[in-house]
């Protein structure tokens, strides 16, 4: 019997599997796809976030010229931003798994059963795998993770192109975090939920451009995002000449937190770890995998008398302590506000937000502020914001009051 069975081999699965294996635990991996199969999606992260972990060698690209547009003048961010070398990131975790003796089993988890001191996962092929604890990392629709139902799920959606263009779609050597300019849209189109350009120069005349909806319920269709991207490029006199890769991105931003008393532990999207106000997650995987692994190792090492349910509860609390739960609800509260803002309010909000001390907006986006620091940053934003943003923040609609009280009442 294994100490832990990790289901899934995406970034979340490899991150927690590597941390568990490095702690000397007997870990089995179960994945429906080859864990060594190359990842396709791009993953970005702020430079200091990776530097603080001593993992800057995992960057494939890094930009010091980082800007956003919430009007005609660029906002200089004064922080560098990077794109992971996907192969390097994947190999980093796979090497740690191998060093810890982890073995991968190809197969799809089909059923799970629990007794007092272990869980048994049955694969679609009928194989049974037993472990003291199961960690499900199979994403936002993880079959073994229970969470409250919600009819108000907001999705971040994006359509992007890596390729070559008739002329640079952005300045050479530049990274654009958000370009909310909408001069390429008709007045009627501007009444629809706003989208922004996320773009970067990858070198050798290759650029990545992506039209992104920060969050919308229901999700903005890919066809509309693609149309808007081509409209944006055409307005700037840019045509697509070579498409090397098309990227489609869709994930929920505000999934309810899982049931923290269940006997299966989640990680990554399965554990609602997407930053509700920004969509970032890979930095959180790197920072929080050790927290979960430590909690699991402590539960296994402290006493063999811990039941499966008790071990899972200890693990969940290691991943979601009270302060993180409270911050999560505050971020969800903020997301509700952003989705209600008009285009003008949204631009005014972001102009104010990125006018905060850079440690505050950076800490907000990376979820590295303490709870008191987060509240201080939000109060400062309210004090400095123009009246239309203040009014939007004060006006309470929909789920906003519920989320506010959940943040206060979290235990």
UniProtKB/Swiss-Prot annotation:
Names of the cofactor(s): FAD
The protein's annotated pathway: Carotenoid biosynthesis; beta-carotene biosynthesis; Carotenoid biosynthesis; beta-zeacarotene biosynthesis
State the source organism's domain of life. Bacteria
Q: Does the keyword Isomerase apply?
A: yes
Q: Which Gene3D superfamilies match?
A: FAD/NAD(P)-binding domain
**What Pfam families would the database entry show?**
Lycopene_cycl (PF05834)
- Keyword tags: Carotenoid biosynthesis, FAD, Flavoprotein, Isomerase, NAD, NADP
How is the protein's activity regulated, according to its record?
Inhibited by the bleaching herbicide 2-(4-methylphenoxy)triethylamine hydrochloride (MPTA).
Q: Name one GO molecular function term.
A: lycopene beta cyclase activity
One GO BP annotation here? Answer: carotenoid biosynthetic process
Instruction: Report TM segments.
Output: none
Binding-site residues for NAD(+), renumbered to this chain: 4-32
Reactions accelerated catalytically: a carotenoid psi-end group = a carotenoid beta-end derivative; all-trans-lycopene = gamma-carotene; gamma-carotene = all-trans-beta-carotene; all-trans-neurosporene = beta-zeacarotene
Q: List the disulfide bonds.
A: none
The protein's Enzyme Commission number: 5.5.1.19
Q: What does this protein do?
A: Catalyzes the double cyclization reaction which converts lycopene to beta-carotene. It also converts neurosporene to the monocyclic beta-zeacarotene but does not cyclize zeta-carotene.
Q: Which family does it belong to?
A: Belongs to the lycopene cyclase family.
Q: Which NCBIfam families match?
A: carotene-cycl, LycopCycCtrL
Protein name per its UniProtKB record: Lycopene beta cyclase
Organism for this UniProt entry: Synechococcus elongatus (strain ATCC 33912 / PCC 7942 / FACHB-805) (Anacystis nidulans R2)
Gene from which this protein is expressed? crtL
